[in-house]
């Protein structure tokens, strides 16, 4: 792989490893570009503290550490400072205000929740609720329409186990939108390696028929994920099997 834009750090409280170890693993495996995109902090008005993302107080250290690594390894690899974030409309203004003074190169949209996290409605849990599926697709499209996000992480995270006709209808709508906007779909290495419900063959068949492009995201939660050549090759084989041209460079990011 030439590039990976989906990399976490220990600050999200469910990843492990030093920041430098991720960089050195990427260099060892021949990456030319490494984008960090740890789970973005949210400002919870009720004082809730998320166990699965960095806290607002940790963002300074994240940016400081990665800025230093950018300089230290400039001759070996291009490093970007990004964030993975949900699009939750009622919380977005406060988040944008909080982030505006930080040198964030990009964000990717990872829609793990459709509502503020403390409500506990995770989109990866099995459901046959058609209204929730439509809400997921509507909200992802609305999020991408803001222009805040480089691409959509694990688009097939939503674990719909209901009517396959509805699944095809709604995810086709999403794939058509992404194609029109020239946004690649992510083939998620973590999901593949961990035998999760994604990458989902049903979703990939839809993407193939629509003519989407794809990007491979390591979704690294440990430096070793960047060295998992077998899983990376398996992801690449999926792009070939479903005839999804691979995207690895984004012109809007300067090197």
Residue ranges and their predicted role:
Residues 39-57, 103, 108-125:
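Active-site gating loops and adjacent loop-to-helix segments of metal-dependent hydrolytic enzymes
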Residues 77-122:
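Hydrophobic alpha-helical segments and helix pairs
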Residues 184-193, 217, 221, 232, ...:
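Active-site core of metal-dependent hydrolases
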Residues 19-32, 90-104, 136-146, 173-176, ...:
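Short amphipathic alpha-helices and their capping/turn segments at secondary-structure boundaries
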Residues 213, 229-255:
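Mid-to-C-terminal alpha-helical segments outside catalytic/metal-binding sites
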Residues 71-77, 210, 242-244:
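Short helix-capping segments at alpha-helix termini
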């Amino acid at each position: 792989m030439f590039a990976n834009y989906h990399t976490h750090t220990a600050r999200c409280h469910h990843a492990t490893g030093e920041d430098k170890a991720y960089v050195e693993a990427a260099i060892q495996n021949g990456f030319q570009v490494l984008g960090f995109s740890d789970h973005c902090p949210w400002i919870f008005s009720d004082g809730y503290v998320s166990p699965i993302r960095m806290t607002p107080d940790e963002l300074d250290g994240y940016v400081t550490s990665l800025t230093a690594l950018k300089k230290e390894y400039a001759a070996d690899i291009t490093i970007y400072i990004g964030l993975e974030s949900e699009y939750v409309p009622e919380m977005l203004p406060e988040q944008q205000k909080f982030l505006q003074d930080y040198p964030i190169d990009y964000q990717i949209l990872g829609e793990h929740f459709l509502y503020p996290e403390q409500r506990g409605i995770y989109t990866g849990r099995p459901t046959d609720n058609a209204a929730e599926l439509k809400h997921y697709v509507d909200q992802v499209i609305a999020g991408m329409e803001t222009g805040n996000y480089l691409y959509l992480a694990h688009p097939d995270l939503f674990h719909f186990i209901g009517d396959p006709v509805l699944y095809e209808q709604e995810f086709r709508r999403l794939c058509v939108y992404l194609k029109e906007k020239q946004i690649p779909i992510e083939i998620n290495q973590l999901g593949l390696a961990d035998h999760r419900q994604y990458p989902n063959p049903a979703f990939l068949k839809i993407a193939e028929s629509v003519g989407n492009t794809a990007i491979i995201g390591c979704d690294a939660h440990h430096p070793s994920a960047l060295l998992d050549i077998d899983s990376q090759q398996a992801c690449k084989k999926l792009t070939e099997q479903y005839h999804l041209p691979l995207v690895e460079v984004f012109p809007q990011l300067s090197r």
